[in-house]
């Protein structure tokens, strides 16, 4: 509530609208991790039921707290003209309370899965850039913490968990068979590309029931997906009440942030794709320009050698 008051806006009109509606966006992060730790597959009926219960709890708790704050500080200014009043909702401090954001970057910092997305893969290569006095680039082998911990507990040792992940990296298309050979429930570890478009949409729709804004969700489709497959995914999202949805066909970009598969480019090829910044000189010449913006004065420093 206090953050809304002190927020800085580039235009006075934006500040006015935000203070009149006082929209906030509580959300979810780490959903896929939770399912793995509970032993539930992302595309199972049990996972949908759990999402329904958690979404309802989050939504009702958020509105209850918003109503409590409204008793102390008053409802949002546009409450009297809002649909919330028409629907019989008591005075609340915020016109909207729930948003499930992408959280793609902050979830990696936090070490958990993003939003309500399934895991992208059990193990993958992250395209990273390391810089030092010479400049180097490489790919980093990674795995979701919940997956690694679950495998370690199931298999008994950290080395065994690593061995399984190495096998999956080499042969990702047979990941479920590899896990089955080691007595693991492959369905629990089913990843984004192995989950049907229908299951992706159903998960989003169940959360959307309890979200007052939008849900960030990607429907992952294989490279072989047709135009009709994409059309069907969007139609199902519309029919199930999703406010917005994104469809991504694997390999539709020349370079992806995350990759699966056994092939790794050698260092020479990587350097062709990843540009390494050259070393900055100790002293450079430069000029400073003062630029007027809608958010005040900005100083831009331009340096060159």
Q: Language-model segments: what does each one mean?
A:
Residues 1-19, 23, 40-103, 183-188, ...:
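Internal maturation/activation junctions in enzymes
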Residues 19, 29, 45-47, 81-84, ...:
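Short capping/connector residues at structural and topological boundaries
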Residues 259-303:
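Short, Gly/Pro- and small/polar-rich lid/capping loops
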Residues 30-34, 50, 65, 146-150:
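A general alpha-helix detector
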Residues 1-6, 88-89, 98-257, 298-305:
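Catalytic alpha/beta core of large soluble enzyme barrels
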Residues 22-37, 105-108:
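Contiguous, well-ordered alpha-helical segments that form the cores/surfaces of helical PPI scaffolds
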């Amino acid at each position: 509530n206090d953050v809304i008051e002190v927020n800085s806006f580039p235009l006075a009109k934006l500040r006015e609208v935000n203070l009149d509606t006082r929209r906030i966006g509580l959300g979810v992060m780490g959903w896929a991790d939770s399912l793995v730790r509970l032993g539930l597959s992302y595309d199972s009926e049990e996972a949908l039921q759990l999402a329904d219960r958690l979404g309802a709890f989050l939504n009702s708790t958020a509105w209850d707290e918003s109503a409590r704050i409204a008793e102390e500080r008053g409802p949002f200014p546009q409450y009297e003209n809002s649909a919330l009043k028409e629907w019989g909702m008591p005075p609340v401090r915020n016109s909207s309370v729930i948003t499930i954001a992408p959280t793609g970057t902050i979830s990696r910092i936090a070490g958990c899965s993003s939003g309500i997305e399934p895991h992208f893969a059990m193990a993958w290569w992250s395209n990273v850039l390391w810089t030092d006095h010479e400049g180097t680039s490489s790919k980093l082998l990674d795995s979701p913490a919940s997956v690694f911990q679950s495998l370690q507990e199931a298999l008994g040792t950290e080395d065994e968990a690593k061995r399984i992940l190495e096998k999956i990296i080499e042969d990702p298309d047979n990941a479920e068979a590899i896990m089955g050979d080691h007595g693991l429930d492959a369905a629990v570890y089913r990843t984004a590309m192995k989950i049907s478009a229908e299951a992706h949409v159903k998960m989003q729709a169940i959360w959307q029931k309890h979200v007052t804004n939008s849900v960030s969700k990607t429907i992952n489709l294989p490279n072989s997906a047709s135009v009709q497959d994409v059309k069907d995914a969007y139609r199902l999202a519309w029919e199930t009440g999703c406010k917005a949805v994104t469809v991504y066909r694997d390999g539709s970009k020349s370079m992806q942030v995350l990759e699966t598969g056994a092939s790794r480019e050698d260092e020479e090829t990587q350097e062709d794709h990843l540009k390494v910044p050259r070393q900055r000189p100790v002293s450079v010449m430069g000029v400073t320009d003062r630029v007027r913006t809608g958010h005040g004065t900005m100083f831009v420093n331009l340096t060159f050698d």
